[in-house]
A protein has these predicted regions:
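Conserved catalytic cores of phosphodiester-cleaving nucleases, focusing on short active-site segments
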Residues: 29, 50-69, 85
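Short, solvent-exposed loop/turn elements at beta->coil junctions and helix N-caps
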Residues: 39-42, 111
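Short, low-complexity, polybasic intrinsically disordered segments
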Residues: 113-137
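Protein kinase-like catalytic core scaffold
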Residues: 46, 57-59, 109-111
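Surface-exposed interaction regions that form or flank ligand-binding interfaces
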Residues: 1-5, 104, 132-137
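Short acidic/glycine-enriched loop/turn segments that link adjacent beta-strands
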Residues: 43-46, 118
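Acidic-basic catalytic patches of nuclease active cores, encompassing PD-(D/E)XK
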Residues: 1-39
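Catalytic cores of nucleic-acid endonucleases
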Residues: 7, 65-118
Length: 137
């Protein structure tokens, strides 16, 4: 019974640190001039951590928190997660067209914010989701 309690507490702490990383990412994006449209937006296909807009660009953000600096291969979503994220962003974007004013051109972008235990941010911009039209730069 003691082990289950320890595992529960460890998981709960990881969840709280992840939420804190999302909140700090939100503040960072606001300071950069992004308008936050949604936070932890749920869809039938999964959840997107942050959805922001600046000008004609809509930014979808996945926030990762790790205690240690991870390799990029550990940060990038797995193929199954990429498919889920792509379907979720497509679902959200199709609904955003009804909420946002029409524009001649909308640019979609997907970024990953990777936070480590010491508060270091590594931002991956324009991350490609395989089997999609988005590309890693």
């Amino acid at each position: 019974m003691k082990r289950a309690t320890y595992t529960y507490r460890k998981r709960r702490l990881a969840d709280q640190l992840g939420r804190l990383a999302e909140f700090i990412s939100l503040l960072y994006l606001r300071a950069q001039g992004w308008r936050i449209l949604f936070r932890r937006k749920k869809t039938p296909f999964g959840e997107i951590d942050l959805i922001c807009r600046r000008g004609n660009t809509i930014l979808f953000v996945e926030v990762k928190y790790r205690r240690k600096q991870s390799e990029i291969s550990q940060i990038l979503p797995s193929p199954a997660s990429q498919n889920r994220l792509y379907r979720a962003t497509h679902y959200i974007f199709s609904n955003l067209q009804h909420l946002e004013p029409a524009s001649d051109m909308i640019c979609l972008r997907f970024d990953i914010f990777s936070w480590t235990g010491f508060g270091r941010l590594k931002r991956y911009r324009n991350v490609a989701l395989e089997n999609t039209s988005w590309h890693f730069e």
